[in-house]
Amino acid sequence: MLFRSWATTNPQRRARVMFEFKRLIERDMNTLAEILSSEHGKVIADSKGDIQRGLEVIEFACGIPHMLKGEYTEGAGPGIDIMSMRQPLGVAAGITPFNFPGMIPMWMFGIAIATGNTFLLKPSEKDPTVPVRLAELMMEAGAPSGVLNVVHGDKTARSEEHTSELQSH
């Protein structure tokens, strides 16, 4: 099962994938902005801003190994020690709106993937090309196939289909 494989991948290895993903987005910034502009209608400067604001969350995700350490408090009370562990949850999902097709998907999947979860993304049917390209870049960065999954279709049909599917797991 892919989730278990990705969840048990060393956090530093997952961070390296995120660093490479960040580098690839920076490399392809102009192309992504042109795609977003032509498909959505935003001017290039706004399109670059959309991508850049999503990239800022990816930059944060690159430092995830430090955040995954958990905590230990000895002597929190008489005979009480406290230990917290952070573990991946499983499959996360996001249905994104049309207005920020680069930023919002990265806000959703960046942290989820960096912390060892897999992600199911349903972008808006009005402008899905940038999210699809982001998934391709994630694979190019070294994430195994299936870590970031993109599905398409009418929002009503897809929402009902995947909501019931996710609830059954």
Please annotate each region the language model reported:
Residues 50, 154-156, 169:
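Short, solvent-exposed coil/turn elements at secondary-structure transition points
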Residues 18, 62, 96, 165-169:
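Generic short alpha-helical hydrophobic face used as a protein-protein interaction/packing hotspot
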Residues 11, 89, 168:
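ATP/adenylate-binding site constellation spanning eukaryotic-like Ser/Thr protein kinases
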Residues 3-68:
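Glycine-rich loop-to-alpha-helix module at the N-terminal edge of alpha/beta enzyme cores
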Residues 1, 55, 93-95:
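Alpha-helical structural elements
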Residues 53, 64, 137-140, 169:
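A short linear boundary/processing microfeature
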Residues 70-164:
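Rossmann-like NAD(P) dinucleotide-binding subdomain of oxidoreductase/dehydrogenase enzymes
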Residues 1-2, 162-168:
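Short, small-residue-biased leader/transition segments that mark boundaries at the very start
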